[in-house]
Structure formats: structure tokens, C-alpha cells
Design a protein with these regions (language model features):
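Cell-envelope/extracellular polymer assembly enzymes that use nucleotide-activated donors
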Residues: 3-7, 33, 174
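Active-site acidic Asp-centered loop
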Residues: 39, 84-86
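Short, acidic, metal-binding catalytic loop of nucleotide-sugar glycosyltransferases
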Residues: 22-32
Length: 243
């Protein structure tokens, strides 16, 4: 059986940890190991880690944003890696779905929400995945909420290590840009068939609830920082499907 290492991200949603932990343990391809990168919020949120004896935790005294977990992922030992946002609860065949796509369709970067941009301001775009189910694998510009990939792609993430435009966003664009530039690989949303949610990358009810709560970056930060990051990578040569 293929092996998958999971990297969770903790900040202000301790209530989602148990759901995530139980979900990744119960996949048709169960997680071989589970890591957690915990950022330190301004107002300390209590996480109870006592019941998670096999969870490898890096608990920090600062908020390193969304980028550091991809450095932490270098500690994993599996062939495949899945990095999950803390608002994302994968369905039971999510890992299996991604592995099938990589091994039988196209190697590349996969995720549960795929985005195709219509402008560089990050205001007009098309989403695919749990928010807009796609029956077949869909090529996209970037993916978010989860990133599933062969560990060989992780090296490409760090080929360019310039200071990010923002520590709160841009890691998704950076990853897709780097694999496109250095590995000639693309980014995809695997199938999210309407009649089989076991393949989906996120529980849509929970994703909608967590993704718009008070701790959601997309809700609490103006889209201009996302647009600035997108323009940055486009200026460096990031090829977008509709632009």
C-alpha cells in the first residue's frame, strides 16, 4: 500500500483538530504519520494534545503564517505528502483519489479547491472542487485548502526562497509557480463527483462553516494582498490558464 504523511496546521481552531485527526486516520489509505505545525496566535488558543500520542508537534512562540509548514514537511518519510488547512476535513477516499490521479493520469500538484483566475487582482476567478464539483480531473492555476503531492515536488517549493509578499498568503501560488517553472508540472483538482462525496477533499458543510468564520484569512484580510502576490508571481513568469 502507498504511504502518505500528513501535515496539519494549527492556529485558532482547536475544535477542528479531533475531526481532522480522526479523518486522516480513517482513510482507505491511512496516514503513515501525522505532523502538526502550530503557530502561536496573538490571543493564545488552548489545544489539548494529550490524546494524540502519535502526533508529531512543532509548537511555536510566534506566528509564521502559511509558509513554514512546507518546511516542516521536509521531516516526513512517506512517498506522498498531504498538507491540510485547519478548516479542511478530507473524506475517506481523498488520498486514494489523489494517488490514482498522480499515478494513472498526470503527476503534479493536487488539491481540494482548484482556482482558475480571470484577472490579476484575485477578484474574478472560477473554483472547482468541493465548492463547485467537477466530474473529471481539472487543470487549474492553483489549489488551496489541501495540497497533495509526491514528495519529490517539495524540493521545487524551495528552489526560490525570496521573502514572501505576505506570510499570510501566497504559498499556493508559489508552489504551483515553482513546479511549473522547474519541473514542467501542472496543478490539478482531482474529481469531486456529485454522487460520490467519499472522493472529496473536504466535507462541504464543515468547510463552509470553518472557511468563513472569524479566523478565516480570506475573510479577515483584504483581497489586495492576494492580488499583490498573484501579480508578483505572474511578473516572474507564472503562466495562468485564462490570462
Amino acid at each position: 500500500m502507498k504511504e502518505v504523511s500528513v501535515v496539519l496546521n494549527g492556529f485558532r481552531r482547536p475544535f477542528s483538530l479531533e475531526k481532522q485527526y480522526n479523518a486522516v486516520k480513517a482513510r482507505t489509505v491511512p496516514a503513515k504519520e501525522i505532523f502538526m505545525w502550530k503557530n502561536h496566535p496573538e490571543n493564545e488558543t488552548q489545544f489539548d494534545f494529550s490524546k494524540y500520542t502519535d502526533l508529531a508537534i512543532s509548537s511555536n512562540n510566534a506566528n509564521y503564517g502559511v509558509w513554514a509548514r512546507f518546511a516542516f514537511a521536509l521531516n516526513t518519510t512517506s512517498e506522498y505528502i498531504c498538507v491540510l488547512d485547519d478548516d479542511t476535513i478530507p473524506s475517506e477516499k481523498w488520498f486514494e483519489n489523489c494517488i490514482h490521479c498522480i499515478e494513472n493520469e498526470n503527476n503534479g500538484l493536487y488539491g481540494t479547491i482548484g482556482v482558475i483566475f480571470n484577472d490579476l487582482d484575485y477578484r474574478s476567478y472560477i473554483r472547482h472542487g468541493w465548492a463547485n464539483p467537477n466530474e473529471e480531473t481539472k487543470e487549474v492555476d492553483i489549489v488551496g485548502h489541501s495540497w497533495f503531492f509526491h514528495r519529490d515536488l517539495l524540493g521545487a517549493f524551495w528552489r526560490e526562497s525570496t521573502v514572501p509578499v505576505s506570510h499570510l498568503c501566497g504559498e499556493d501560488m508559489h508552489f504551483s509557480y515553482d513546479i511549473q517553472k522547474y519541473l514542467d508540472l501542472k496543478t490539478y483538482g482531482p474529481p469531486h463527483p456529485k454522487d460520490d462525496k467519499s472522493l472529496w477533499g473536504s466535507d462541504p458543510e464543515l468547510a463552509n462553516r470553518f472557511g468563513v468564520d472569524k479566523d478565516a484569512i480570506s475573510v479577515n484580510h483584504h483581497s489586495s494582498i492576494f492580488g499583490t502576490s498573484l501579480k508578483h508571481y505572474h511578473s516572474k513568469g507564472f503562466k495562468l490558464l485564462n490570462i
